[in-house]
């Protein structure tokens, strides 16, 4: 039986394939990505992950299902204890300071992506917001699985790849997929279409995120 997320996966494939094959990922696996570009990516991702974690708690506040609430609460805490902690290890290796973090402007694409997810919740529904969060989980897992066999000659990049191919991370992805299917079963056809729309938009923002990082996007880019 084809599930709701099976349908999402099929619809998003053109965008996801572009992400897997994006020059950012290709250069990272080849060990050719400038460290300044990875540094830029990490600084932007710190903002993104912080808001991503908050959204887990905010969505949980609007749900009634105990299992769903528990997963989202643990997801929010896991981001603090796990993925964000990994990023902190990267920051230490790259000598990224708290002052540098505080002074780094949020790039337009990162800003808009986060606002898109908040809009899915506050101008939409918790089910829609769950669907908007799913591509970040799922796409990174697919990228990790796609490039793990090749790896990267740069140890920092190899650590990044291994984060998203780990058994623990894959388990979280599978739980998020199950939660999205559950959410889809609770709403009508019109709302499932809205869930589909935000999923595709999040997938497009994921693709834009690589390009943002490669170009070191800033707000001046909007006026050029």
Task: Mark where each language-model region is.
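Short alpha-helical hairpin
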Residues: 9-34, 52, 177-186
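Long amphipathic all-alpha helical oligomerization modules
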Residues: 169-200
């Amino acid at each position: 039986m084809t599930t709701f997320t099976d349908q999402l996966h099929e619809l998003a494939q053109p965008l996801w394939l572009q992400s897997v094959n994006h020059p950012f990922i290709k250069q990272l696996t080849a060990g050719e990505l400038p460290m300044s570009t990875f540094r830029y990516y990490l600084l932007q991702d710190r903002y993104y992950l912080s808001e991503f974690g908050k959204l887990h708690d905010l969505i949980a506040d609007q749900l009634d299902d105990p299992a769903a609430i528990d997963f989202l609460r643990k997801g929010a805490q896991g981001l603090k204890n796990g993925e964000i902690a990994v990023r902190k290890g990267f920051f230490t290796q790259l000598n990224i300071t708290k002052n540098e973090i505080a002074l780094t402007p949020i790039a337009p694409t990162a800003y808009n992506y986060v606002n898109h997810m908040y809009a899915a919740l506050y101008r939409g529904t918790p089910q829609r917001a769950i669907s908007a969060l799913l591509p970040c989980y799922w796409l990174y897992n697919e990228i990790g699985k796609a490039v793990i066999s090749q790896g990267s000659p740069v140890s920092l990049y190899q650590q990044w790849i291994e984060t998203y191919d780990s058994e623990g991370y894959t388990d979280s992805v599978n739980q998020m997929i199950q939660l999205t299917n559950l959410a889809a079963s609770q709403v009508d056809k019109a709302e499932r279409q809205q869930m589909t729309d935000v999923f595709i938009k999040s997938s497009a923002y994921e693709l834009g995120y690589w390009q943002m990082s490669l170009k070191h996007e800033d707000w001046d880019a909007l006026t050029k």
